[in-house]
């Protein structure tokens, strides 16, 4: 099945190769497979999926019982069997975020969060703490008019790229998340000190633009490192990790 019938992120899912159609007054269902085409009408990647959907701000394909995340360039990554399950360590804080209405519903919480969805979370928290916040300004990016993105950019929580784009469906890294969380925390009226008297073992891999934010978020307990005293700045940041850290930010400022 297809859940979208228009171009999203420059791509559109279509059905191909049907040999049998079951018609009705409401439409028809074929027995073909599905794939993505670009705006020139060319297939991008394989087109042998049993189902194809736009889920969690990305295309997810299904072959048999296996699910795949499509990168929009022809590549695909098979999702782990537990992709739709919340991690045990995150359950309590995820539930708290839902209770505080600062969460989003993700089908696959273990997948990396996109820039647009991080903005949606950040704005949810901002509007929770600042209920009289002004409306989103006019779109500031050539490729994105999402209201949460526009407001997050106007507040200084996120920035775009030199070419005027925002790249909303690009995933964020851990150090990018730290920088955005730090700016969000400041926007909410607080400022964390960037104590780094105990640097991470991979401190040299931190971007200069992110270093103070990484340690500031550690200092107030919003975002911690990983095993062996490493931060792993270029690793992806999952959707459930994003919700958990936004919940921690809420606890820190409420």
Can you describe what each PLM-predicted range is?
Residues 15, 175-176, 241:
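Glutamine-centric residue-chemistry signal
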Residues 1-81:
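Residue-level detector of conserved, function-critical positions
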Residues 7, 13-16, 61-62, 81, ...:
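Conserved "repeat-terminator" motif of extracellular CCP/Sushi domains
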Residues 238-245:
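C-terminal/domain-terminus segments
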Residues 73-91, 95-148, 155-175, 181-211, ...:
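Feature responds to low-complexity, polar/acidic, surface-exposed segments characteristic
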Residues 9, 33-34, 56, 67, ...:
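Disulfide-stabilized extracellular ectodomain repeats and their linkers
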Residues 39, 219-221:
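Tandem repeat domain/solenoid detector
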């Amino acid at each position: 099945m297809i859940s979208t019938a228009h171009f999203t992120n420059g791509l559109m899912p279509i059905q191909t190769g049907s040999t049998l159609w079951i018609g009705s007054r409401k439409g028809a269902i074929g027995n073909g497979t599905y794939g993505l085409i670009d705006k020139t009408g060319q297939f991008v990647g394989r087109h042998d999926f049993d189902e194809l959907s736009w889920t969690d701000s990305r295309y997810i394909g299904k072959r048999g019982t296996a699910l795949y995340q499509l990168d929009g360039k022809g590549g695909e990554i098979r999702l782990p069997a537990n992709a739709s399950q919340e991690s045990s360590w995150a359950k309590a804080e995820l539930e708290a975020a839902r209770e505080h209405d600062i969460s989003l519903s993700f089908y696959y919480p273990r997948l990396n969060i996109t820039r647009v969805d991080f903005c949606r979370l950040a704005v949810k928290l901002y509007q929770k703490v600042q209920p009289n916040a002004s409306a989103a300004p006019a779109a500031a990016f050539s490729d994105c008019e999402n209201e949460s993105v526009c407001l997050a950019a106007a507040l200084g929580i996120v920035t775009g790229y030199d070419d005027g784009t925002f790249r909303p469906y690009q995933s964020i890294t851990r150090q990018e998340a730290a920088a955005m969380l730090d700016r969000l925390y400041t926007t909410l009226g607080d400022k964390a000190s960037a104590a780094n008297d105990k640097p991470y073992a991979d401190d040299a891999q931190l971007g200069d633009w992110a270093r103070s934010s990484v340690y500031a978020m550690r200092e107030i307990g919003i975002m911690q490192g990983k095993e062996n005293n490493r931060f792993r700045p270029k690793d992806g940041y999952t959707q459930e990790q994003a919700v958990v850290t936004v919940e921690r930010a809420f606890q820190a400022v409420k």
